[in-house]
Amino acid sequence: MSRDRFRSRGGGGGGFHRRGGGGGRGGLHDFRSPPPGMGLNQNRGPMGPGPGQSGPKPPIPPPPPHQQQQQPPPQQPPPQQPPPHQPPPHPQPHQQQQPPPPPQDSSKPVVAQGPGPAPGVGSAPPASSSAPPATPPTSGAPPGSGPGPTPTPPPAVTSAPPGAPPPTPPSSGVPTTPPQAGGPPPPPAAVPGPGPGPKQGPGPGGPKGGKMPGGPKPGGGPGLSTPGGHPKPPHRGGGEPRGGRQHHPPYHQQHHQGPPPGGPGGRSEEKISDSEGFKANLSLLRRPGEKTYTQRCRLFVGNLPADITEDEFKRLFAKYGEPGEVFINKGKGFGFIKLESRALAEIAKAELDDTPMRGRQLRVRFATHAAALSVRNLSPYVSNELLEEAFSQFGPIERAVVIVDDRGRSTGKGIVEFASKPAARKAFERCSEGVFLLTTTPRPVIVEPLEQLDDEDGLPEKLAQKNPMYQKERETPPRFAQHGTFEYEYSQRWKSLDEMEKQQREQVEKNMKDAKDKLESEMEDAYHEHQANLLRQDLMRRQEELRRMEELHNQEMQKRKEMQLRQEEERRRREEEMMIRQREMEEQMRRQREESYSRMGYMDPRERDMRMGGGGAMNMGDPYGSGGQKFPPLGGGGGIGYEANPGVPPATMSGSMMGSDMRTERFGQGGAGPVGGQGPRGMGPGTPAGYGRGREEYEGPNKKPRF
């Protein structure tokens, strides 16, 4: 009432933004009120100021709703209102059916409105009573009988029923007659199915027809439609009590309603748009990276009728997305269903719990996770990702989380939820039998089945067992025990027992903490000692390896030395063999020479004489001749000199001797005759080529002792 009284100007059965009433009753007239000829159920066209609107008039009390349409509008606006906004002077017919689009919530369906936008439930009121909205409120009438038609200002904010006639074209002459108060009231917007009149189609920005029941009342004028489809009751002169409010439907009822009134094409389009918008809203309920159709999205539905079918059970949850796994036990009256995300499951649980179905109240709860494990003794450095990675070797994981305190520090506990029971059983058995480590520290994790408790719904009164013990215990209401009474004494004993349990738990926790600290210190010392032993063993291993490598190196060097010695010995032996062979060859050559010399040295005198020349004439003048030797002359005859041979000319003899003395070669240049060859006797030009060969016998070693 406090904020809405600024919105209602004038009486009548109009909605929030009805300004101005009938002329006779004298309601507060707005400066943009329609002229006297305008009707209630007609859309507003271009209009101009009426001929009688000249000056302000005093406020008049609002008229009754049945006389609102018969009274002419007041001719003066309130004195506190500002001067009116002047519209363009020329008529523009296309502005009649093109009002601006109303503000709509993306999560709400469209509502039944007239050509003007209707504010939502949470829309802000006008700034003050002296400054009304800039949109001129009208009752939806054709252009009045002013001097000239004017274009329509921004559209009116009152609602029009779906069955209203279409807007009339602008005219500058005769005004149309308004409908009488005694005539039939406008049809309500809640009537399903196609309306009798043409569909109240919106303009380029106008909303569609209403979808929700509860349109404007027949006797109270058109009411303001809320986003849920319910009209706002008028505050003054309406057919509903002042300040009356209606209950808004829940979230899912706002999205799923019956077909809207109007043609079948409009209904199908609206149904498609609603389904698309609803699917988009469902997709927004899923968190980024959240897995779909998990065990956390599984709902338990109890107290089901015995004759329920699977299709009916699915239709019950169809508005919350496509259901996944469905199971129904008709004999015991319960079932399970798996939805897409946890948020959808929470919405379905909140809306369908305690819903009556064939005389039974449905009980909807989250199903217990049959494949969840509790993990304890976690290191402070284990995160959700590491926990999931570590346990993913046993099977697919739906969720793995490390429980933290209010400051975000790890409590050493975690929860791992598998997708199937065999994987959870395998992880439990493997971790119980073996030692499963997650970090470097030898701190094994302890795996146990998760104890699942319901801390959301608890135990409501309707689910408590009404047995005789329950009746006996509930006879006395809650109270504080009086001092000195029986219940006070035993209550104190109960409290002392609880205190003793608390102390013992604290002592056990303290002992366990000390034992853990001691084990950690021992483990740290043992770890350091173990590391030292490992280093020692590694050093010994390296030393042994080094010694072995040295031995191998020594052996290799010894082998190389032996090979070098063998090679040297072989080389020495080859050299000795070569030297021996050379000596043998030299000895053999020497023997051959000696043999040749010995054969020449032991020649008989006749053969030597034949080789050296006859008559002994060769020894004359020769240093190797008989004149220089101490042995007797070899040649025959007494005198072998030049004097003994007077027949030899001196020049020839001297030339022959000179030629033989000047030779540098051991043998002659001519053909060497045989050793025993016999040349011509005598000296002179007829001396053979091998003449000087006989001189070699004087150079041999066997001839040296003769000197």
Curated annotation (Swiss-Prot):
Comp. bias intervals (Low complexity): 120-132
Substituting L535A results in:
Impairs DNA binding and ability to mediate transcriptional activation
| Cited InterPro entries | NOPS, Nucleotide-bd_a/b_plait_sf, PSF_NOPS, PSF_RRM1, RBD_domain_sf, RRM_dom
Query: Basic residues bias located where?
Result: 244-255
Q: Which residues carry this modification: Asymmetric dimethylarginine?
A: R9
Compositionally skewed regions (Basic and acidic residues) per UniProt: 579-597, 693-707
User: Region Disordered: what ranges?
Assistant: 1-273, 579-707
Q: How is it modified after translation?
A: The N-terminus is blocked.
SUPFAM superfamilies recorded: RNA-binding domain, RBD
Instruction: List, alphabetically, the Pfam families matched.
Output: NOPS, RRM_1
Q: Which residues carry this modification: Phosphothreonine?
A: T368, T687
Cell compartment(s), UniProt? Nucleus speckle; Nucleus matrix; Cytoplasm
Q: What CDD domains has UniProt attached to this entry?
A: NOPS_PSF, RRM1_PSF, RRM2_PSF
Residues modified as Phosphoserine are S8, S33, S273, S283, S374, S379, S496, S626
The RRM domain, residue ranges: 297-369, 371-452
Gly residues bias: start-end ranges: 9-26, 206-223, 612-641, 668-692
Annotated spans, 3 X 3 AA repeats of R-G-G: 9-27
GO molecular function annotations of the record: chromatin binding; DNA binding; histone deacetylase binding; protein homodimerization activity; RNA binding; transcription cis-regulatory region binding
Carrying Phosphotyrosine, the residues are Y293, Y691
Q: What is the effect of changing T687D?
A: No effect on interaction with THRAP3 (phosphomimetic)
Please give the function described in this protein's UniProt entry. DNA- and RNA binding protein, involved in several nuclear processes. Essential pre-mRNA splicing factor required early in spliceosome formation and for splicing catalytic step II, probably as a heteromer with NONO. Binds to pre-mRNA in spliceosome C complex, and specifically binds to intronic polypyrimidine tracts. Involved in regulation of signal-induced alternative splicing.
Which comment does the entry carry about domains? Answer: The coiled coil domain mediates interaction with NONO, and can also mediate formation of long, linear homooligomers (in vitro). The coiled coil domain is required for optimal DNA binding, and optimal transcription activation.
Q: Which disease is it linked to?
A: A chromosomal aberration involving SFPQ may be a cause of papillary renal cell carcinoma (PRCC). Translocation t(X;1)(p11.2;p34) with TFE3.
* Subunit annotation: Heterodimer with NONO. Monomer and component of the SFPQ-NONO complex, which is probably a heterotetramer of two 52 kDa (NONO) and two 100 kDa (SFPQ) subunits. The coiled coil domain mediates interaction with NONO, and can also mediate formation of long, linear homooligomers (in vitro). SFPQ is a component of spliceosome and U5.4/6 snRNP complexes. Interacts with SNRPA/U1A. Component of a snRNP-free complex with SNRPA/U1A. Part of complex consisting of SFPQ, NONO and MATR3. Interacts with polypyrimidine tract-binding protein 1/PTB. Part of a complex consisting of SFPQ, NONO and NR5A1.
Name of the protein this chain belongs to = Splicing factor, proline- and glutamine-rich
- State the organism of origin: Homo sapiens
